[in-house]
């Protein structure tokens, strides 16, 4: 079964459970959280028990009598509670039990939203809960992690842009059927999921327009979305915040040495492609996801991800900065012939950030270095990193 392929988050989550009383496993709808807990994680944790609050009776009990609900899971280690945000009252009860017994690995709370005040969750479990984000599947996860030894081809790359990494959709071979699944995902997100935030007055039509613009707009900022949709800027901001809380959008802030406002990217290249996004936008999303997975599940401190926009409105699509201050800049290029002037934006960025490593990702056949810029094939995003050979431009 394609869903059952191993996930890179597994070993990291198991480590968190060894040291933290509560762990939150969070991610957008259909990224594979439930299967991850029920099957992959349960194989590693023989004393675990899984329950979902999608069941109305369980949800009511968890909300109205949370200690009674948790008593049924007393022998589980961990107690895995899916869609935990649907019972805000549960969080106070978890805090109460954890404060009495702080053994690590007692609870795993799964959620398709942030656990925040927007969901009427007052108790943040600060100091008691570790967080693990589950992203769409990476290229290596889709191909069985270490099972695939063949080098990544251009055709593999193009296929991944279109199919994305949502486990229940990416393996559907028929393009029409896959498109229907993507459309179902968009409709469920905009017609149902956003209305979980009962304190907010959210509009299905505006949410649908926002997803389309986040795929197609050159700079999907709040101001641009408000201008195109002719919606109130505050209303647009509220919708963007809600979609970010649902992990549907990833927000990228501008690098402090550049210009511009925050942009919003869809979480998955397949969804972006379905909504009309360009190949470059799909690669930007894939690059961000691959880097997020690589850094989020390591023992190092998380990286900060931004973009760079010059005064001439040219874009470096991703800036990755480590806690140590090390910076990597990635510009995505869509032409097979790379000339010296094409490197100028990255070189200008380095003048402002002298320690930055510069990467130009282009549809070239092999990598090379020129004047401090590494020109690399698109496929480099998904492969084990090797030093490119040197060559003139």
Each model region followed by its residue ranges:
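A cross-kingdom feature that marks ATP-driven nucleic-acid transaction machinery
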Residues: 2-3, 15-18, 23-24, 28-30, ...
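Short regulatory helix/loop adjacent to the ATP-binding pocket of P-loop NTPases
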Residues: 115-130
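Conserved catalytic/switch belt of AAA+ P-loop NTPases
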Residues: 91-113, 123
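Short glycine-rich substrate-engagement loop in P-loop NTPases that contacts/grips substrate
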Residues: 48-78
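Conserved P-loop NTPase "ATPase switch" module shared by AAA+ and STAND
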Residues: 74-90
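Dynamic helix-loop-helix/coil hinge segments at AAA+ ATPase domain boundaries and subdomain interfaces
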Residues: 1-10
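A short beta-strand-to-loop transition that corresponds to the Sensor-1 phosphate-sensing loop
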Residues: 110-114, 120, 136-137, 362-365
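Interdomain hinge/linker elements that couple catalytic modules in large macromolecular machines
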Residues: 135-136, 140-282, 297, 303
């Amino acid at each position: 079964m394609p869903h059952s392929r191993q996930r890179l988050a597994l070993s990291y989550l198991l480590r968190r459970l060894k040291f933290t009383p509560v762990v939150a496993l969070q991610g957008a709808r259909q990224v594979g959280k439930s299967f991850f807990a029920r099957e992959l994680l349960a194989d590693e944790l023989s004393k675990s028990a899984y329950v979902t609050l999608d069941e109305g009776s369980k949800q009511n009990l968890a909300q109205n009598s949370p200690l009674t609900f948790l008593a049924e899971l007393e022998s589980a280690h961990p107690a895995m509670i899916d869609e935990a945000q649907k019972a805000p009252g549960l969080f106070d009860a978890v805090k109460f039990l954890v404060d009495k017994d702080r053994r690590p690995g007692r609870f795993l709370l799964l959620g398709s939203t942030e656990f925040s005040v927007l969901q009427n969750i007052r108790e943040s479990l600060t100091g008691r809960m570790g967080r693990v984000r589950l992203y769409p599947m990476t290229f290596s996860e889709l191909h069985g992690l270490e099972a695939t030894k063949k080098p990544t081809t251009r055709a593999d790359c193009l296929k991944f842009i279109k199919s994305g990494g949502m486990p229940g959709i990416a393996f559907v071979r028929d393009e029409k059927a896959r498109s229907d699944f993507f459309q179902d995902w968009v409709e469920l997100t905009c017609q149902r999921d956003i209305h979980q935030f009962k304190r907010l007055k959210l509009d299905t039509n505006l949410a649908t327009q926002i997803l389309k613009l986040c795929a197609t707009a050159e700079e999907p900022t709040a101001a641009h979305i408000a201008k195109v949709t002719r919606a109130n800027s505050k209303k647009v901001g509220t919708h963007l915040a809600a979609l970010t809380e649902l992990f549907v959008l990833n927000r990228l802030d501008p690098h402090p040495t550049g210009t511009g406002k925050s942009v919003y990217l869809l979480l998955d290249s397949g969804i972006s492609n379905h909504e009309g996004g360009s190949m470059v936008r799909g690669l930007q999303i894939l690059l961000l996801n691959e880097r997020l997975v690589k850094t989020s599940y390591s023992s190092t401190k998380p990286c900060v991800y931004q973009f760079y926009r010059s005064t001439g409105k040219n874009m470096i699509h991703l800036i990755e900065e480590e806690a140590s201050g090390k910076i990597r800049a990635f510009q995505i290029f869509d032409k097979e012939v790379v000339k010296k002037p094409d490197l100028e934006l990255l070189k200008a960025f380095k003048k402002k950030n002298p320690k930055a490593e510069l990467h130009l990702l282009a549809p070239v056949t092999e990598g090379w270095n020129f004047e401090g810029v590494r020109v690399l094939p698109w496929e480099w995003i998904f492969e084990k990193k090797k030093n490119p050979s040197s060559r003139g431009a």
